[in-house]
Design a protein with these regions (language model features):
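C-terminal capping segment of individual leucine-rich repeats
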Residues: 48-51, 254
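Flexible "cap/lid" subdomain of the alpha/beta-hydrolase fold that forms the substrate-access gate
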Residues: 2-9, 16-18, 25-28, 40-42, ...
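Conserved alpha/beta-hydrolase "nucleophile elbow" surrounding the catalytic nucleophile
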Residues: 33-35, 102-103
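Conserved short acidic donor-positioning loop in nucleotide-sugar-dependent glycosyltransferases
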Residues: 266
């Protein structure tokens, strides 16, 4: 049986000190957050999954309670930098292979890892993933009205404005957590407070925004062979405003070993919006 609660740890990979939580025993299963996220976004999933797996949930570089490298985004916050952190992390634990569940920006980093180190990835689960088949649809009308934040995050003063007070940080984070959920009233005050505290850590807003800056500066793989042959299940919420379900149309081109499931009535944060359904899907797919 899983222990009562996850334990907190730190390790250093590629010169970056990463915070992570761990719970359970068995085959390793990593849960990797996106933006605006950190380890806590999986708090409804860690315990149930830990009854079946050794669950490991990091704060990635630049986020929450991990180090925030003071490097240009196109150097320190590329998909390759994050992929190398994942590789170094599993090397630290001497894992031959891992299973990974991820979404949002985490899906970008993990796709890069899957292409660089396919032999290290046993199975993959993605929620509403950004992927190459979306192309320029982010900035077509009317979707561009949902994607404005990606341009805002390019501004050098963005973190100063959002971080000018905890109240400002709360307003900004609460907007995305609510607007991207099928039920905008889902989030409790305690949950919002946890996010605000994480993003009030020195450099945390900048670290998250740097991921978007890196993407706009050529820091994400967009050419060459973008195929991922790892057995992959994609769960896509049909109420996700920022990544509409229609964008799943080209997944088979890039994931030839694909299982796609439409999650009805679920928005962008399905791990929080429908944890029981999500946990059951993960366990069913990941168990050999």
């Amino acid at each position: 049986m899983a222990t009562a609660s996850p334990s907190h740890h730190y390790t250093t990979v590629n010169g970056v000190k990463l915070h992570y939580v761990r719970q359970g025993a068995g085959e390793p299963l990593m849960l990797i957050h996106g933006w605006p996220g950190f380890w806590f976004e999986w708090h409804k999933n860690i315990g149930p999954l830990a009854e079946h797996f050794d669950v490991i949930v990091p704060d990635m570089r630049g986020f929450a309670y991990s180090d925030k490298p003071d490097l240009p985004p196109e150097v320190g916050y590329t998909d390759t930098a994050f992929a190398e952190d994942i590789r170094a992390f599993i090397d630290f634990y001497h894992f031959d292979k891992v299973r990974i569940v991820t979404h949002d920006f985490g899906a970008v980093w993990v796709q890069r890892f899957a292409r660089m180190y396919p032999e290290r990835l046993h199975k993959l689960v993605l929620f509403d993933p950004p992927y190459a088949g979306i192309g320029g649809r982010w900035f077509e009308l009317p979707q561009v009205f949902h994607s404005w934040y990606q341009i805002f995050h390019q501004q050098p003063w963005a973190e100063d404005l959002v971080g000018s007070s905890k109240e400002a940080t709360e307003i900004y984070l609460r907007h995305f957590l609510s607007a991207w959920s099928a039920n905008p009233d889902l989030w409790t005050d305690d949950e919002i407070a946890a996010y605000v505290e994480a993003y009030s850590q020195p450099g945390a807003l900048r670290g998250g925004f740097n991921c978007y800056r890196a993407a706009f500066r050529g820091g994400m793989q967009s050419s060459g062979d973008l195929t991922i042959n790892t057995p992959t299940m994609v769960l896509w919420g049909d109420s996700d405003a920022i990544l509409p379900y229609a964008w799943s149309d080209r997944l088979p081109e890039f994931f030839p070993n694909l299982t796609l499931k439409r999650m009805e009535g679920v928005g962008h944060f399905m791990m929080r919006e429908a944890p029981e359904r999500v946990n059951a899907e993960i366990i069913g797919f990941m168990k050999d």
